[in-house]
Structures are given as structure tokens and as C-alpha cells.
Amino acid sequence: SFLYYNTLGLASSSGKTFKNSKTKLTNSISSFFTFFKSKYDLKTETYRIFGFSGGSQFVHRYMMYGKDERVEMAAIGSAGWYTFLNNEPFPFGITNMPIDKNRLDWFLSREVLFILGKNDNDPNHSSLNSNYGAKKQGAHRHQRGESYFNNLINYAEINEMPFRWRFRSVEGLDHNIEEMTKNAAPFLLSGLEY
């Protein structure tokens, strides 16, 4: 069981870090990709990934703390909270779990579509993290997402790092995976022959 999959098994959603976790997921997708690449004789060296809500939390932290550099593109949306590039403790920030500069360069330079629903603004949503660290990021998912995206822009500018993420706020969209997928799919499928 991966109760804390959204933090890669590195911390609880309240911020308690796990130093010796045997269930760290920092290389999990890479292992699956390697297996399927071998089993089906896939010729590609990269893959594209999508995460919604808790999956979005997983994907952005996987890209931050993972060892895998085979993610070509990602689309993430509607996370309830994020790991900011700031001095907050993990999983809300990186102060006690720093990231190597080369990894940050890689993370910020990936092609990522960051999608928020304009109507994903319920501060009392049943699955929204209501811990103090998450509430500091904003009242609801849309606010927290805007804050996170702006944090990444500012970090990249201050540190003169490339930033290739795209922001999309979708009118009328609430916390809905089907509609989020419709917005992510054209981006993730662009340029593929299928």
C-alpha cells in the first residue's frame, strides 16, 4: 500500500518526513517504463505523463525528486497542494529536502502543461488538504495552483533558469478528471504518430 504516494512516500500530508522509508517512489515510473519498454520492444527513450489531483501531486514531486530523466512532457492539474521552491519544510517546500541544481534545471525546463479549473475553488472540498502548510498556499485548488506556478516563474527568473511550463486556467471547470483529461490529451498527444 502506498498511503503517501502523493509525496513519493517521503512524508505524510501533514509534513512528517520519513527518513528511512522502504516505500519511496522516487524511481517508480522509471521502473515501469523500463519493464514495458523491454517487454514490448518499444524503441522510444522517453515517455509522457499525466496527473490529476493526487496524481498531479505525485507527478510534480516525482519530477522534482525522482532520478528519472526520461519524462519528455507532462500535464498536471488540480493538485490540492504543492512542494514550492521556497524555505518551507517538505512537503510544502524544499528547505529540509534540497534539490540538486541540475535536477531543478531539468525540472523547470521540461514541457509541462499546468492546468487549473477556474471553478475548482471550493475551500471545503472533501479531498482538499486542510493542514496549515497547505492552507498557506491558498484557500482552494485554483488559488494554490496559481501561487505555485508564480513561485516557479519567480524561482526560474531569479536563478536564471529556463522555464518551459505553460499555464492554462479553464473556464467552467471544477474538480473533474474527465474534463481535465480532455484539456490535457491534445498537449500530450501532440507530435505523436498513432
Where do the protein language model's features map onto the residues?
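Extracellular/periplasmic catalytic domains that process cell-envelope and extracellular macromolecules
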Residues: L42-K43, K67-E69, L104-S109, E160-M161
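C-terminal catalytic histidine-bearing segment of alpha/beta-hydrolase fold enzymes
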Residues: E146-Y194
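Serine-hydrolase catalytic machinery in alpha/beta-hydrolase-like enzymes
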Residues: S1-T46
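Phosphate/oxyanion-binding active-site loops and adjacent basic polyanion-contact surfaces
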Residues: F18-I29, F90, H140-G145, I177-M180
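The feature captures the conserved acid-bearing segment of alpha/beta-hydrolase catalytic domains
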Residues: E72-M73, A79-E157
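Short loop/turn segments at strand-loop or loop-helix junctions that form parts
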Residues: S1-T7, G77-A79, F114-N121, V170-G172
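Short glycine-enriched nucleophile-adjacent loop
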Residues: S56-K67, A184
